[in-house]
């Protein structure tokens, strides 16, 4: 009986201390043109479907995007699949203000939350850095297939970089 109680106590302690946020950060998928608020191209729509497929077991509780339609469209299928609310984070005040607001929103979530962030090539690395992943590499304009998964446990951050969808033409 003592062993059972000890095993139960250890199990509860492990479950309590194993809570960590999981943050997936991707760039929006391919766009139709270089206009300021371009929609997704056919390749981008395929990548958005691939993102939803790649995250089918992730169960995000929140999806964060910029207000530009290419980020919203990239995130839509994943948010819909998981019935996760999608919030846009303003670009007013510039990139630094946007990055700070995204990081603050993530930090306000429960410590065991799973969140998807869809950003831009010039914000994705800085968002990762703002969340504690100092080694985040800059993202070339031609790269669309990088997914950064951060596990944030208190002050400790672990990162896993993976690829999804068709390989980027870089």
Model feature map: region roles:
Residues 7-15:
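Bacterial N-terminal signal peptides
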Residues 20-112, 124-130, 135-170:
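Active-site-proximal alpha-helix that buttresses catalytic centers in soluble enzyme cores
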């Amino acid at each position: 009986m003592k062993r059972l109680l000890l095993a139960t106590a250890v199990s509860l302690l492990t479950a309590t201390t194993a809570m960590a946020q999981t943050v997936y950060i991707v760039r929006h998928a391919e766009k139709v043109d270089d206009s300021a608020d371009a929609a997704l191209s056919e390749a981008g729509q395929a990548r958005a479907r691939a993102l939803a497929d790649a995250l089918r077991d992730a169960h995000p509780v929140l999806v964060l995007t910029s207000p530009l339609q290419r980020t919203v469209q990239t995130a839509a299928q994943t948010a819909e699949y998981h019935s996760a609310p999608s919030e846009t984070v303003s670009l007013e005040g510039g990139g630094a203000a946007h990055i700070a607001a995204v990081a603050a929103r993530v930090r306000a979530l429960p410590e065991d939350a799973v969140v998807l962030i869809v950003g831009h090539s010039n914000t994705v690395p800085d968002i990762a850095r703002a969340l504690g992943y100092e080694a985040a590499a800059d993202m070339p304009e031609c790269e669309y297939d990088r997914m950064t998964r951060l596990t944030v446990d208190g002050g400790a951050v672990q990162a896993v970089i993976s690829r999804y969808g068709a390989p980027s033409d870089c």
